[in-house]
């Protein structure tokens, strides 16, 4: 057991999280250190066939230990796509479930949805010692939208780790989305299920390549002159 440092309670997510490495029990720290090691990074590189070099995040931004109690949810979403402090793109999510004797009727299935958010392609029960590795990009919708129905005193627990690279394929980018934002989306047939991100005029412009070119020019030349 460990003390959780963050409590999320809103329409999109009801969960606890702790990303402070020093708060974890020693076995958890050692396990996370291994998953962030060069040995494991090489394994991931070969497994995923990602061309860009994968980089671990020892800061555990958004990762670490997660816990969801009875009634908790994590609505379908795409993750933030950039590291908050490093110039890196997010590429891979790893989830390790810690739920002994977890039953199907407890729910909490990880759902992987298609790019158009019209169909759930895969449901994964969060049973003990199960690891899920999946690509994270601007179209990789996932979550567990149905409230967990485990008994009182039980909870859905997991370790979450994220891996990054410098650059990513254009096919993984949705220019209408703001960098470093989590986007929650309603499932087909569920109206106002989430508090989604606003898509105003600026976001609309981001869908055009000329807008991206202008912004890159601004960053490269105009902002540099101001410094």
Q: What function would you assign to each model-found segment?
A:
Residues 1-47:
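Non-heme Fe(II)/2-oxoglutarate
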């Amino acid at each position: 057991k460990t003390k959780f440092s963050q409590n999320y309670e809103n329409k999109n997510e009801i969960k606890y999280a702790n990303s402070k490495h020093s708060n974890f029990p020693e076995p958890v720290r050692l396990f996370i250190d291994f998953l962030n090691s060069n040995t494991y990074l090489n394994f991931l590189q070969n497994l995923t066939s990602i061309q860009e070099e994968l980089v671990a995040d020892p800061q555990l931004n958004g990762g670490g230990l997660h816990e969801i109690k009875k009634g908790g949810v994590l609505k379908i979403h795409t993750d933030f796509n950039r590291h908050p402090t490093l110039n890196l793109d997010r590429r891979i999510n790893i989830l390790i479930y810690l739920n002994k004797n977890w039953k199907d009727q407890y729910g909490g299935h990880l759902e992987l949805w298609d790019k158009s958010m019209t169909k759930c392609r895969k449901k994964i029960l969060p049973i003990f010692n199960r690891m899920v590795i999946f690509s994270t990009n601007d179209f990789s919708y996932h979550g567990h939208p149905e409230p967990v129905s485990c008994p009182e005193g039980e909870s859905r627990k997991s370790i979450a780790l994220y891996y990054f690279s410098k650059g990513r394929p254009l096919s993984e980018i949705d220019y209408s989305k703001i960098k470093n934002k989590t986007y929650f989306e309603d499932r087909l047939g569920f109206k106002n299920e989430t508090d989604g991100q606003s898509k105003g005029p600026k976001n609309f412009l981001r869908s055009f390549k000329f807008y991206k070119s202008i912004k890159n020019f601004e960053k490269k030349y105009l902002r540099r002159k101001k410094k």
